[in-house]
Amino acid sequence: MTLTRRSLMRGTAAALAVPALGSLGAMPAAAQDKTWKHGLSLFGALKYPEGFKNFDYVNPAAPQGGTVRQVAFGTFDNFNTVVAGVKGSIAIGTELYNETLMTSALDEVSTEYGLLAEAVSHPDDFSTVTYRLRANARWHDGKPVTPEDVIFSFNAFKENSPQLGAYYRHVTKAEKTGDRDITFTFDGPGNRELPQIVGQLPVLPKHWWEGTDKNGKKRDVTQTTLEPPLGSGPYRLKDFAPGRSLVYEKVDNYWGKDLNVVVGTRNFQQIRYEYFRDSTVALEAFKGDQVDWRTENSAKNWATAYDFPAVRDKKVVLEEFDIRNIGVMQSFAFNIRRDKFKDPRVRRAFNFAFDFEEMNKQIFFGQYKRINSFFEGTELASAGLPEGRELEILNTVKDQVPPEVFTTPYSNPKGGDQQALRNNLRDALKLFRDAGYDIKDTKLVNAKTGEQFAVEFLVDDPASERFVLFYKPSLERLGIVVNSRTVDAAQYENRLRQWDYDIIVASWGQSLSPGNEQRDFWSSAAADQPGSRNMIGIKNPAIDKLIERVIFTKDRDDLVAATKALDRVLLWNFYVVPQWTYGKVRSARWDRFSRPETMPKYGLAAFPTIWWFDADKAAKVPQRS
């Protein structure tokens, strides 16, 4: 479920205060027989009952105030989330003012509790869902959040956002069915996840978007904008420098501040983001006390760059947080829209040429392990040979998948020394020859055309280029021409939108309950959809069938089996060269902040969502800038 996963990656906390049904107000006649609930669970019961006070992992008495300064990478020229990923570069932090109907708890899997919505109802067959808005939900201009706002937002995203449009394509209509009620109708029954997906809809103010700006120009929800948008959330945009920095400030009269979804969260008075184009510069900014928090993605930096005076004096705290909320595939991903990558033997040959074990020793200080699944680190990852329900599912596509799916456990080639690399390159060359290539004058050429095999790795940061440069000599030993092209964030986004690349570094985060987002990742329908996450260009009937099997599962065991089957077929088609994972979030912070004693199991660091500014600590660690 991608939208929920995105909120988890942001560390967004969620909670709900729902009154007893007697206080919901008069129901419309059509809704009299509805069973209203305070939350949704994909499988099983909700942890938190109706009327709960706050989430277990927050401090309801957390001090309020203070400023936190964070890092963002790249640039931004847009605040309109409707066209994010299609036009311009969206600013970080839009979730601070854009609220959703429902929101997720960070200590549960695939549950939602109402935020803008106070209650939700759906029939047993999941063919529709109805949300009831809270009577006190307000925009920052004081106007109420209405069903018309929800319907406007749904239509805007469905018509203009390729990614969300793909999620909502099975929602046939949204209509007002009561003073505060909105009903969404689906194109068929049985899709248990659709009510939750609709609940993750960011709600926009219809009256603001259909109005005019300070210059009298009519606003356009289909275009980028740098006009600070009207929101309903706990923060508003106070100040910004395009492409450089953002300052969000807490809304004093925020309508939802006493909701138990909000209690203990969003405790800072200001949240600042400083943009950097280079991770090395960002690290130096952190060392210089220009930002408060840093997530470290470099193994080398983690091993060598944090022995500076503030760390030794315990003014900077280094801490790792377990990753339990997502599975991940990080990879060198092929664009199989290009003819040279259509043959899976070619793609597999690239994996034989990648010596992860040697790279791990030389570059990563031995910190990483190889990824062997598209759902790495979860119970959803396939292993061994298929059996039981997974085997039954795979048998439904047996004639459409590689035979190894049933006979051979997937594993990546092992390197780590020169003999192992020579053996792997020998296997790679055999695969190339089987695919119609040959060696001529030390060059790998197409046996029919004589054209040398050439490949370009497209990256957007120096760290990724470093990985490519390590990989490059092995490919060149096979007679391949290898180029690495590093471009800025805007160029990178534009080339991705146009599918203009050979190989990119790509990753897919996976929730613990996969569902409709798998269509956006791997389906034939998404392969030619601009803005989709099917960056590989997969058009595979077996995978399409398995995706639908994942979406329409009826219980957790069936979901796990169907996901393992999908994982196995993806792996044996060699769409990517899997990279590596650490399994933890590495973080560094200036010691001015505190957090609850009990951290949410699936919330990563949950910073800054459930943390707060600690004045006593800050007095001992005064800011240098």
Model-derived features with residue positions:
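Detector for C-terminal structural segments
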Residues: 8, 13-21, 72-74, 96, ...
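N-terminal lobe/hinge region of extracytoplasmic solute-binding protein
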Residues: 33-125, 155, 230
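Aromatic- and charge-enriched surface segment that lines or borders ligand/interaction sites
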Residues: 58, 62, 85-92, 119-163, ...
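Gly/Pro-rich hinge or "lid" segments in bacterial periplasmic/extracellular proteins
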Residues: 92-110, 155, 199-265, 269-270, ...
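Aromatic-rich, solvent-exposed beta-strand/loop patch
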Residues: 114-121, 125, 140, 145, ...
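Surface-exposed binding/hinge segments that line
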Residues: 132, 166-214, 232-241, 386-398
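Ligand-site clamp/hinge motif
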Residues: 134, 223, 254-306, 348, ...
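Extracellular/periplasmic solute-recognition and catalytic clefts
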Residues: 173-176, 238-249, 274-338, 348-349, ...
